């Protein structure tokens, strides 16, 4: 601890003096959200951490840290210093390859990282570096206080730091690979002295300010020198101040967490948190300026009073420093005008922060050498030509710093920038270029580089061009340089050519050849970077390009030697004139040629007439100049400024000018007013029936899309690129010219839904993840269950482009990225293939990349396929675009395609490029015939599509007006439409000035017609102004916009367009056109039609014509109070609960009149997954109530069973009642037909009115006398009708049981009897068992055991004529007796006298007793007659005759039906057998719930009934049974077939309901290991168990665990991933290769054979495990 008598020697001493001083100890030192630390608390916590760290790594450790700024990390830094150690913070966004290099350089004692950082945990393990993982949620200020404030104060044996020891290891930000990593060691002494110097400078800047206790707004990462040498040292610790987090760490739990962007958070803190110091980068100050001025580019807008408050707060800041890069002049001017005290700091890590600092005016005036921060430093400028020079005063050169305090060099990296003399003076060459003003101030000019910086923002590396030029045999040496040389940004690129001696001898002939060398180079360069011939200097033989002694171009001397030659103009400057009265083609051509020759500096006629303008080096500026000069010289000509892009060479431009000047009418390429459509091969119309999308701004549904378009919400959709993507600040604005984009969530993904393990999902590119999601969701939007497509010829077309994911993978994992998932996870071809594979569809599966027209190409290819295929009627179209790596953004910046302001200001005077956006869109296309068949909702009809190419234009990426106009014409012709038939056009509309002009010209060329537009002006919309440019998905976003306009009846206005800023160069009068800035209503006539246009930088053009759907005809509304089945399903129980919650919200807002359609769609329009909910509701209110009840229940949903576990139970006689089939027959035509046909047949054969009894509508006739003969037939007909009806719905039993008479129906279901034979048997049996009037008989049911009933019979003194016998044993306390009517009366009376419940049945025969012996001969005769028609059982029959199971494949005994009528019914025994051997649900098929009740009484709990008790709704009971079967037992009826049977089926329609709630989890390389590793878990123990055939040593449970471990191992599940044993291997993503590995593993390790059938979806993993355990047990028994 520092004594108060001695000055502090380290910042740690300063901190301890404050923390242990009674006057300052309780001051706040740190504020994070609502949490605060005092100096004393931080001292205590850091001491405790030091003690813990000491036990881990000892004294004087080097502790590396990879984490965002976090309170725990600051405490840790102090702890490391208290141990005498070195703190090495590493940028959290550094790629893994660089992190590995950094760790090798610093050789840390340990690496401290958040517990969630699996990637760096793996990396550290690979490098054998101990890891200390902290849990961010357990490391908050309150949690650390709770844990450590009770600890004792710092122990006296902590050594503290040697002032001359490195306190920090900081890496520079310039590294591009491990080879140039530079680590700067900064000692405690150096840090303290520089901090003191910086504080002294602050006081000089603000002498009136008391800095004591200042509140400092902290933002800079602690891996950056700015954080330590500005925020922490000079301002916080040296002033006993408080460090305030500008943004709360992402992992820090706090109630005050602010999700706003950095600029908004900083502004909020400056206004309301009392901060007085803030150090930041230029873009932050630019953002604050934009907030103050409410610029349209800012993410969040302030109210007028808030803007005033922010400006006032900025004016009262004490320190507001900008570092890291030079401040924009506009921001500097704004600060000066508004008296905002901005200061500028220029420095680098090697110098411990700023070298110079000064007020904002220093940008222009320079920095005083007095404002240096290294006390003993000397600054001087040196020559930068790498040659020796004597010491002399120079006014410009590289800055060199000389000081004894500077670091002695980089750690572990030898660099000539540092040198140390014998006296200990360190000389450091900064690599920065400065000039010295006459008054001795230093002005920063930039870095010493060879790159050419253009005024247009592009940066050009001249060396590749120089190399290409030197490949010519004519050129000896070439130098490419900007026209400003080294004096600033260049407006043009120049070339100096030194010829080979042999070329010089050819004289003038070389000029033409050299021009041809430039042609292909210029053709491939963006227009601003092309080298015009007027900027090419070909040297004379005596002239040479200056070179250094090292053989490199001496670029500094270029201006001195050739400046005047390159700066002069070439050619004749006199202007040509033309006589407006007489136009001669030859004179006009010469005039045009003369102007082009002079502007381009090309005098060779052959070159002018044979090369394109691009090949001649024409830039955008030169093209504009030529158009303006031609307009000025040639009276009567009014060429657009992009004329040279429309007419791409001299001959075509001359012809166009001649035609305009001579008032010639060019060939009319506009189609006739109406043409017959071009016939497609199949004559099929294609319609859109489904859509889904993921767009920036969380635009994921039609409501949010509509709101975004109508409100023109671009400012909330296009946002700053966050740090969790990449460190964008390190690229902006030098390499990437924009800092905003439209981004979607690419980190979170529901991998298990798509059958992927977490490991495989990590390798799946976000582009493909989104494609999968939207494709599946589009099918749901179209109400197409995915299983409906299985095995079909459905096609899949996906448009993608390079998303940088492969680069990210390789950067993250290096060679280790090449796992078995590498290819399939990132190859573009698998984007479509994966969708086809998951859906099991067999049509074309094609991935397209034509850049920004990809989506349109997919639509076109799909339509060709659907119209030409006789086997297909559906196609899935998708386009997906993400940006995982900043490389494409740099490409766009270099091409000049993007807007520095981050917007698409299409068709405005502000148009300066587009803003890239991410997004994915999917559409479902069907033939109209199929859509009408399936009752689909049609969103639009696709009238025509067309794909073409620009051909040769001003370069590959340049637009071609003629080609675009031809595309429009072709579309109209294919659609058979005139221009007037198109109401609006969704433009490509990227917002580039040249592209906008070309697009409008093409529309004018194609749509200008001699016939006036009676429908009003042609409206031009541009969705990119709101959404941004989603590139390959752009055409599909355009389609979304059109569909939205069709639905809303209005075209949205363009964002960024106002009433005053429409580009005046756009011709809106010819067609005419309307480019709206507000929504425009679409008036009649209908149908509305629109064209969608797209253009890829590949040159591929795409166009689509869409027609709005017919208006829905108003039909009589369905009653909204009828019973309807409502179902919901999900793949996990958490998803199901979320789904139900979302449905509750949805239904509360829904129209009650839509109740039936919602329920119908839930059944027929969704896939049915394993976790289910189903209910029967009568109206919307009822449905909402049932959902609320379910959500209020705490019982988690369970997965449904397999479909095979289903048995039918058939009731016997006594369950019948008049009209028992009436209600279901009325409700369902399918059942009505089945029961009517069978009843009619039975009536004809039996002579009884079976149909009238079953379908009687006078069901009030209760007192109908029993007729056992007719009753038996009725029961049979009813139950067999229900059986057949269920079978038509796909509900089939896997086992059956029949009570008495019901066993005949059961035998039909089991396949033992045909329906005809069974009907004949029932009729014959009923006739044979007919009751006798002379011997009246009956049956009675008694609530007593069989023994008790036998005892009762014995108590009666009965003669043979009035005998009784037990005829049915239904259960332990349910026995039925048969006998004479008198005997029945007697035993019932006796039982009641003994308090035994007993009642006579409504039957007039004593079945299953000696009373039916007279029927035996006749039944035996029937059996003998039909013995040849007997068939083996197809499913098990639990016989109530035998009380046992008759297995599948067995035949019934020939006397089975004889014994069946005569012998007692052993239902209880049969039920017991069923309980022991059958697992699943049993459905009571009977007309009343008798079998259901009997089964329950015998202990079978999984029972449901299709019928209700008499007097209750049979339809509700039936639907309730279906709900039960669906929810709990995995039964999926044919809902489409069921609903088609309803009387009002034609009025049921599919409607929009909720789509699946994906359970997304984070799947990013930054948060998970990129190379799968196995932790020491059960997985590893499972592996040990399988090191040989050890099966015999394992118990069943161990064997089961070992098999499960093997499955998890092969699936590469992470340790925290559960294995759902109820799922199939296939559903979890196991392919045939993986299955072969599993079979080998279990076969070699356990000696067990895994049957191939377990790879199918028919079996679960649990069933496979059980099979293998049984296999092992059987093997042991043998």
Curated annotation (Swiss-Prot):
Biased segments, Polar residues type: 1564-1576
Keywords, alphabetical: Phosphopantetheine, Phosphoprotein, Transferase
InterPro entries: Ac_transferase_dom_sf, ACP-like_sf, Acyl_transferase_dom, Acyl_Trfase/lysoPLipase, AMP-dep_synth/lig_dom, ANL_N_sf, Ketoacyl_synth_C, Ketoacyl_synth_N
Biological pathway: Secondary metabolite biosynthesis
Molecular function terms from GO: fatty acid synthase activity; phosphopantetheine binding
Gene Ontology BP term (one): fatty acid biosynthetic process
Domain (Ketosynthase family 3 (KS3)) ranges: 683-1108
Region of interest called Adenylation (A) domain, as start-end residue ranges on this chain: 33-453
Secretion signal span: none
EC number, as in UniProt: 2.3.1.-
Span of domain Carrier: 586-661, 1597-1672
Presence of keyword Transferase: yes
Alphabetized SUPFAM superfamilies for the sequence: Acetyl-CoA synthetase-like, ACP-like, FabD/lysophospholipase-like, Probable ACP-binding domain of malonyl-CoA ACP transacylase, Thiolase-like
EC class (word): transferase
Catalytic residue list: 852 (for beta-ketoacyl synthase activity), 988 (for beta-ketoacyl synthase activity), 1029 (for beta-ketoacyl synthase activity)
Family: In the N-terminal section; belongs to the NRP synthetase family.
Protein name per Swiss-Prot or TrEMBL: Hispidin synthase
Species of origin: Neonothopanus nambi
High-level lineage: Eukaryota, Fungi, Dikarya, Basidiomycota, Agaricomycotina
């Amino acid at each position: 601890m520092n004594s108060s008598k001695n000055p502090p020697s380290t910042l740690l001493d300063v901190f301890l003096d404050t923390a242990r001083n009674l006057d300052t100890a309780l001051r706040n030192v740190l504020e994070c959200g609502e949490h605060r630390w005092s100096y004393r608390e931080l001292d205590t916590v850091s001491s405790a951490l030091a003690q813990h760290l000491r036990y881990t790594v000892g004294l004087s450790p080097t502790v590396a840290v990879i984490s965002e700024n976090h309170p725990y990390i600051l405490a840790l830094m102090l702890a490391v210093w208290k141990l005498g150690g070195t703190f090495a913070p590493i940028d959290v966004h550094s790629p893994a390859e660089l992190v590995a290099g950094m760790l090798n350089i610093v050789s840390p004692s340990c690496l401290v990282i958040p517990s969630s950082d699996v990637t760096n945990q793996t990396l550290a393990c690979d490098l054998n570096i101990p890891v200390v993982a902290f849990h961010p949620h357990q490391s908050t200020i309150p949690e650390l206080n709770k844990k450590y404030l009770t600890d004792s104060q710092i122990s006296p044996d902590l050594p503290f730091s040697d002032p001359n020891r490195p306190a920090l290891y900081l890496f520079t930000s310039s590294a591009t690979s491990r080879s140039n990593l530079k680590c700067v060691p900064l000692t405690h002494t150096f840090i303290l002295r520089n901090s003191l110097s910086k504080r002294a400078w602050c006081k000089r800047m603000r002498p009136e300010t008391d800095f004591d206790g200042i509140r400092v707004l902290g933002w800079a990462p602690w891996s950056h020198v700015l954080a330590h040498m500005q925020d922490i040292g000079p301002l916080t610790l040296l002033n006993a101040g408080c460090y305030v987090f500008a943004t709360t760490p992402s992992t820090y739990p706090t109630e005050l967490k602010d999700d706003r962007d950095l600029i908004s958070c900083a502004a909020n803190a400056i206004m309301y948190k009392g901060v007085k110091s803030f150090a930041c980068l230029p873009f932050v100050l630019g953002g604050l300026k934009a907030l103050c001025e409410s610029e349209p580019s800012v993410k969040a807008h302030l109210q007028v009073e808030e803007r005033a408050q922010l400006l006032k707060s900025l004016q009262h800041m004490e320190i507001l420093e900008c570092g890291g890069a030079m401040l924009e002049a506009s921001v500097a001017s704004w600060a000066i005008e508004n008296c905002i005290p901005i200061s500028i700091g220029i420095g680098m890590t090697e110098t411990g922060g700023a070298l110079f600092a000064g007020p904002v005016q220093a940008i222009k005036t320079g920095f005083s050498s007095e404002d240096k921060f290294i006390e003993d430093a000397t600054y001087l400028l040196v020559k930068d030509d790498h040659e020796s020079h004597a010491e002399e005063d120079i006014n410009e050169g590289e800055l060199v710093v000389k000081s004894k305090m500077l670091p002695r060099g980089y750690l572990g990296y030898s660099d000539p920038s540092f040198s140390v003399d014998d006296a200990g003076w360190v000389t450091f060459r900064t690599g920065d270029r400065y000039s010295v003003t006459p008054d001795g101030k230093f002005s920063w000019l930039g870095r010493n580089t060879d790159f050419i910086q253009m005024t247009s923002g592009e940066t050009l590396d001249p060396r590749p061009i120089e190399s290409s030029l030197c490949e010519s045999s004519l050129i000896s040496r070439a130098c490419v340089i900007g026209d400003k040389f080294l004096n600033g940004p260049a407006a043009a690129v120049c070339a100096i050519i030194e010829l080979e001696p042999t070329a010089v001898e050819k004289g003038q002939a070389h000029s033409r050849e050299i021009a041809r060398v430039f042609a292909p180079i210029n053709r491939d360069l963006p227009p601003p970077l092309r080298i015009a011939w007027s900027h090419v200097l070909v040297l004379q033989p005596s002239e040479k390009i200056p070179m250094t002694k090292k053989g490199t171009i001496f670029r500094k001397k270029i201006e001195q030697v050739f400046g005047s030659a390159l700066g002069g103009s070439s050619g004749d400057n006199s202007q040509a004139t033309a006589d407006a009265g007489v136009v001669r083609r030859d004179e006009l051509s010469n005039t045009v040629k003369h102007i082009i020759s002079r502007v381009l500096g090309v005098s060779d006629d052959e070159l002018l007439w044979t090369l394109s303008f691009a090949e001649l080096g024409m830039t955008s500026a030169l093209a504009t100049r030529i158009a303006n000069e031609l307009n000025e010289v040639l009276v009567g000509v009014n060429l657009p400024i992009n004329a040279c892009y429309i007419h791409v060479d001299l001959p075509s431009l001359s012809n166009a000018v001649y035609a305009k000047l001579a008032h010639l009418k060019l060939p009319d390429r506009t189609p006739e007013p109406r043409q017959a459509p071009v016939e497609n091969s199949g004559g099929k119309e294609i319609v859109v029936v489904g859509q889904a999308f993921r767009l920036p701004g969380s635009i994921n549904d039609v409501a949010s899309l509509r709101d975004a378009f109508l409100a023109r919400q671009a400012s909330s959709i296009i946002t700053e690129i966050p740090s969790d993507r990449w460190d964008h600040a390190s690229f902006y604005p030098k390499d990437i010219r924009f800092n905003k984009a439209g981004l979607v969530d690419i980190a979170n993904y529901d991998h298990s839904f798509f059958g992927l393990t977490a490991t495989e999902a990590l390798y799946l590119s976000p582009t493909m993840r989104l494609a999968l999601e939207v494709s599946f969701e589009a099918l749901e939007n179209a109400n197409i269950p995915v299983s409906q497509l299985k095995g079909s010829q459905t096609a899949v077309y996906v448009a993608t482009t390079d998303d940088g994911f492969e680069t990210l993978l390789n950067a993250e994992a290096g060679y280790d990225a090449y796992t078995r998932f590498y290819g399939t996870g990132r190859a573009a071809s698998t984007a479509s293939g994966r969708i086809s594979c998951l859906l099991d569809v067999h049509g074309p599966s094609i991935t397209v990349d034509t850049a920004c027209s990809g989506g349109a190409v997919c639509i076109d290819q799909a339509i060709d396929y659907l119209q030409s295929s006789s086997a297909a009627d559906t196609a899935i179209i998708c386009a997906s675009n993400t940006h995982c790596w900043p490389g494409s953004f740099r490409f766009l910046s270099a091409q000049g395609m993007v807007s520095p302001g981050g917007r698409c200001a299409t068709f405005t005077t502000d148009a300066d490029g587009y803003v890239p956006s991410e997004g994915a869109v999917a559409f479902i296309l069907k033939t109209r015939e199929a859509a009408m068949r399936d009752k689909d909702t049609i969103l639009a009809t696709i009238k025509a599509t067309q794909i073409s190419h620009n051909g040769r234009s001003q370069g590959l990426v340049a637009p071609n007006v003629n080609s675009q106009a031809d595309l429009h014409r072709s579309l109209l012709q294919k659609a058979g439409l005139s221009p007037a038939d198109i109401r609006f056009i969704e433009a490509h509309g990227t917002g580039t000035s040249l592209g906008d002009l070309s697009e409008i010209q093409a529309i004018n060329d194609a749509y200008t017609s001699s016939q006036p537009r009676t429908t009003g002006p042609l409206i031009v919309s541009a969705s990119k102004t709101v959404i941004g440019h989603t590139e390959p998905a752009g055409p599909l976003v355009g389609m979304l916009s059109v569909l939205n306009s069709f639905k809303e009846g209005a075209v949205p206005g363009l964002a960024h367009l106002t009433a005053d800023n429409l580009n005046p160069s756009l011709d809106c009068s010819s067609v005419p056109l309307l480019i709206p800035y507000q929504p425009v209503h679409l008036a009649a006539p209908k149908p509305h039609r629109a064209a969608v246009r797209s253009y890829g930088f590949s040159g591929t053009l795409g166009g689509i014509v869409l027609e709005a759907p017919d208006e829905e005809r108003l039909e009589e509304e369905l009653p909204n109070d009828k019973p309807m089945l409502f179902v919901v399903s999900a793949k996990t129980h958490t998803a199901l609960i979320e789904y139900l919650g979302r449905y509750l919200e949805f239904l509360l807002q829904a129209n009650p009149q839509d109740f039936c359609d919602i329920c119908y769609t839930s059944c027929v329009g969704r896939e049915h997954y394993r976790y289910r909910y189903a209910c029967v509701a009568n109206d919307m209110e009822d449905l909402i109530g049932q959902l609320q009840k379910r959500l209020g229940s705490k019982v988690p949903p369970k997965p449904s069973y397999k479909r095979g576990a289903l048995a039918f139970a058939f009731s016997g006689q006594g369950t019948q009642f008049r009209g028992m089939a009436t209600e279901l027959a009325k409700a369902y035509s399918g059942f009505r037909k089945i029961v009517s046909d069978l009843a009619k047949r039975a009536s004809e054969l039996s002579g009884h009115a079976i149909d009238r009894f079953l379908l009687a509508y006078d069901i009030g006739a209760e007192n109908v006398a029993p007729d056992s003969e007719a009753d038996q037939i009725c029961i049979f007909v009813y139950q067999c009708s229900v059986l057949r009806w269920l079978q038509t719905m796909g509900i089939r039993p896997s086992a059956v049981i029949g009570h008495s008479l019901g066993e005949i129906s059961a035998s039909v279901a089991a396949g033992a009897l045909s329906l005809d034979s069974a009907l004949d048997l029932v009729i014959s049996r009923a006739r044979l068992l007919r009751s006798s009037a002379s011997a009246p008989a009956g049956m009675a049911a008694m609530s007593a055991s069989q023994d008790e009933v036998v005892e009762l019979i014995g108590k009666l003194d009965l003669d043979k004529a009035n005998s009784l016998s037990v005829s049915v044993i239904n259960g332990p306390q349910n026995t039925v007796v048969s006998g004479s009517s008198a005997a029945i009366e007697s035993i019932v009376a006796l039982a009641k006298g003994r308090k035994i419940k007993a009642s006579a049945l409504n039957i007039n025969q004593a079945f299953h007793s000696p009373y039916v012996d007279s029927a035996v001969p006749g039944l035996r005769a029937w059996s003998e007659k039909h013995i040849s028609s007997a068939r083996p059982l197809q499913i098990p029959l639990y016989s109530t005759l035998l009380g046992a199971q008759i297995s599948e494949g067995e035949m019934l005994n020939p006397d089975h039906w004889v014994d069946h009528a005569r012998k007692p019914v052993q239902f209880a025994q049969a039920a017991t057998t069923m309980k022991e051997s059958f697992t699943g649900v049993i459905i009571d098929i009977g007309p009343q719930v008798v079998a259901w009740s009997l089964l329950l009484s015998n202990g079978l709990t999984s029972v449901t009934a299709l019928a209700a008790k008499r007097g209750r709704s049979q339809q509700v009971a039936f639907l309730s049974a279906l709900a039960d079967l669906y929810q709990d037992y995995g039964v999926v009826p044919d809902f489409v077939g069921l609903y088609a049977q309803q009387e009002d089926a034609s009025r049921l329609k599919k409607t929009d309901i909720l789509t699946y709630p994906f359970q997304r989890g984070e799947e990013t390389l930054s948060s998970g290991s990129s190379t799968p590793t196995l932790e020491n878990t059960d997985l590893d123990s499972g592996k040990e168990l399988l090191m040989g055939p050890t099966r015999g040593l394992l118990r069943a449970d161990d064997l089961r665990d070992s098999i499960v471990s093997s499955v998890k191992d092969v699936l590469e599940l992470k340790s925290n991933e559960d294995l759902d044993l109820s799922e199939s291997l296939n559903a979890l993503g196991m392919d045939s290769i993986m299955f072969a590995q599993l079979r080998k593993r279990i076969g070699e390790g356990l000696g067990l054979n895994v049957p191939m059938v377990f790879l199918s979806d028919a079996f679960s993993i649990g069933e496979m495990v059980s099979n293998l355990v049984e296999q092992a047990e059987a093997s042991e028994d043998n």
